[in-house]
Amino acid sequence: LLLNVKGKERYFPCRNLSMTDHQCFIIDPEDYVKADNTGEIVGVVHSHPITPPEPSQADKISCEDSKLPWYIVNPKTERWAYLEPCGYKAPLLGRQWVWGITDCWSLVRDWYKQEKNIELRDWQRPTTPEEFLKDPMFERCAWRTGFRELRPEESLKNGDLLFMSILNPGLNHVALFFDGDVIHHLTDRLSCREPYSEWLLKCTGKRLRYAS
């Protein structure tokens, strides 16, 4: 982090808790608090060890969330890039998958914000997708986000949620229903719209509708 301490800029190194290789970073909350107690946080500094310093889609999204300027460096080439909040919004379709930043729940939140101007609550994910698969949390979180389960006789409407089991036990994936298709973001794929096929129908365990 970059701090303003008594009028002088100071670099404050923080631990990275992310378990994913070079895909994203998670600043240790304890280090963040220490930095905040040391001075005013005025910027975020991080590296792209194996890629150019140009901001990734995840960088742009996280920069907006942080409301701070970002400084990105490739330590091998010593090239820098600068990024600041500018109102960037990731496209709903074709976005890259990054756990906790642009994943299936992120897509649902962004769709509801863009299409219905509804701000759905975000939920703190486990550090890794593997931890999440051991105890999928979105099903129990949905009830506290304003959704109710559809009755068997109710037909799907645009914007309804489909909780699915994809390749692993438990309802570990969420998709949006839209005009007979689904809009969703599977792990390590680009977000897309595709037909609500027989396979996806078999994967579906619960259907929910926003009720708040």
Regions picked out by a protein language model, each given a short descriptive name:
Residues P126-C192, Y196-S197:
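...with weaker cross-activation on analogous glycine-rich loops/strands in unrelated enzymes
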Residues E194-S212:
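Glycine- and charge-enriched low-complexity intrinsically disordered segments
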Residues L1-I41, P49-C86:
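Conserved beta-strand-loop surface patch within small alpha/beta domains used
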Residues L83-R95:
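Active-site-adjacent structural segments surrounding the nucleophilic cysteine of cysteine proteases
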Residues L92-G100, L150:
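Short helix-to-loop capping/linker segments positioned immediately adjacent to catalytic or ligand/cofactor-binding
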Residues N117-P129:
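Short acidic alpha-helical/loop segments enriched in Asp/Glu that coordinate divalent cations
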Residues W97-E115:
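Active-site nucleophilic cysteine motif
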Residues V44, W70-I72, V182, R207:
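Conserved beta-strand scaffold positions in the cores of enzyme catalytic domains, especially
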